[in-house]
Amino acid sequence: IPSGNIKKLVYFQKLGFYVVDSNIQLSLTKKMIEIKNTNVRFAEPGDEKGVRALARVAFKHNRFNSDPQISKKVACKIKEEWAGNYFSGKRGRWMVVVEYKKNIIGFLQLIRKNYKTIVIDLIAVDKKNRGKGLAKTMISYASINCLGSHEVIEVGTQIANTESLALYAKLGFSIISSSYVLHRHQ
């Protein structure tokens, strides 16, 4: 629900829905400068196990982990399957990975929204390797290799995920909208 539509929010809350997340959508309308890193490449079928393992543990700020009625185990499994769906052709147009000593330490899953826009669907960096510029490098790689001229990258993240918001601001992303994410369990 768009964050400016409080009337709609209240309506759904009266139906038993509750807020689990406040989401910020951002966009980048310029190409990034290429950052050379020989460990960054497009994913290959053999990367699935490493990507799934990272996805299982990397996500803390999301609507599944925030929902008190969804167990931590289930929330982690959802993200693992979400990332794994790239390899079965069910979700994602591209996946960029960072490999170090034969281990996947980062991945970026992208979908095509329309002919001018790609969306960062998932992005994760192994906890031990955060703060080293790997997310920036993967986004740069995607910008150079997945975007045509005059195309846009969009991303959504949780307002509680201040690290991601700081990264996107540093890279030149601008806020385009915000919304509430609601769940209802029966």
Model-derived features with residue positions:
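Conserved acetyl-CoA-binding loop-helix of GNAT-fold acetyltransferases
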Residues: 125, 131-144, 165-170
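A short, internal acetyl-CoA/4′-phosphopantetheine-binding micro-motif in the GNAT/acyltransferase core
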Residues: 2, 123-130, 157-158
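Conserved GNAT acetyl-CoA-binding A-motif
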Residues: 1-3, 117, 146-157
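A short beta-loop-alpha structural element at the N-terminal edge
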Residues: 39-62
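Conserved active-site tyrosine of GNAT-family acetyltransferases
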Residues: 10-12, 168, 173
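Acyl-donor-binding surface of acyltransferase catalytic domains
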Residues: 1-46, 179-184
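A conserved beta-turn-beta hairpin within the catalytic core of GNAT-like acetyltransferases
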Residues: 20-23, 112-121, 130, 149-151, ...
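A conserved beta-strand-loop-helix scaffold within acyl/acetyltransferase catalytic domains
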Residues: 64-78, 84-118, 122-125
